Amino acid sequence: MRSYVHSLAAYIYFALFIAATGVYFSVICMSYGYTDYSQYVFSNSTILYIVIVPILTMRLFAEEKKQRTDQLLYTSPIRPGSIVLGKYLASVTLLAMSMLVSLIEAGVLSMFGSVSWKTVLTGCLGYFLLGACLMAVGMFVSSITDNQMIAAALSFAVVLFCMLLPNISNVVPGRARYTYLVCVLAVLLVAWFFYDETKNMKIAAGVGIAGIAVIGVLSKVKPALFDNGLSKIIDWFSVLDRFNDFCSGILNASSIVYYVSFIAVFLFLTMQGIEKRRWN
C-alpha cells in the first residue's frame, strides 16, 4: 500500500475515477434527473477498467523483477501466498476506497429525487467484484514479465478482451464441431499445465485422455450441449454479463461465487508462478 502512496499510480487512478464518474453523474443523473445511479454511472464506468487495471497492477511484480528486488522476496521466510495476497489486497483497497466517492454522489442524488439504495449498493458491490477480478488478472500478467510497460500493455489487451466478450459471443460460429475443437484444445491445455507442474507424463496423459473421453461421451449423450456451444461458453465466462445483474439490483449468489472463484484461480496461478521461480 505504501508503494501506491509514494507513486503517481494511486493519484492517477483516483483522478480518472472521480473525473469519469463525475461526468456521468452530472451530465446524466443531475442534468436529466435520472436517479438510477447504478445503470447510468456504474454501467458506463466499466470502460475505466481498461486504463485503471494496467496502471494499478503493472508494477506489482514486474518492477521488482526488473530491479532484482524480487530475489529478496524469494529468499525471505514469507510464503508466496502471503506476498501475493498482500499485494493484491493493497490494489483492491484502493478500489474499495473509490467506492466511497460513488456513495457520496448517490447521497447527493438522493437529495433531488428518490434513489433505490438497494440498487446502488448492489451495483457498488458488482463494480467492486468486477474490478477485483480484473485486478487479479492484471497481477498475474505482471508476475510473468519483468517490464512494467509490457505488463501494462498485456493487461490492457486482456481487460479489453474481457470487455468485448459479450460482443464476441454474437459472432462466433455456432456449429457443434467448433465447440468440440475448442473443448479438446482446453483439455490439452489443462493436461499441459499438469505436466508443467508435476513433470509426470502419465498424469498429464491421463488427464488429457479422460477429458477427451468425457467430451466424446457428452457429444453422444447430449449433442444439444454443443449447438451454439462457443457462445454459451463465452457467455458463461463473461465477467461483464454477470455485472449487469448487479446494476439491475439483482444480488445473484452464483455470480458472487463465480467472481470469488475467478479471483481465487488467478491468485493461485500467481502464487504457483512465484513458488516455481523461488525453487528455481
Label for each model-derived stretch:
Residues 11, 81, 148-149, 254:
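Residues that define the loop-to-transmembrane-helix transition and helix capping
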Residues 81-85, 141, 274:
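Alpha-helix N-cap/helix-start motif at helix boundaries, enriched for small hydrophobics
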Residues 60-90:
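Helix-loop-helix units of permease transmembrane domains in multi-pass membrane transporters
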Residues 1-75, 88, 98-104, 133, 193-198, ...:
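Hydrophobic alpha-helical transmembrane segments
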Residues 21-26, 33-39, 44-48, 90-155, ...:
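Secretory targeting signals
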Residues 24-27, 148-245:
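Transmembrane helix segments
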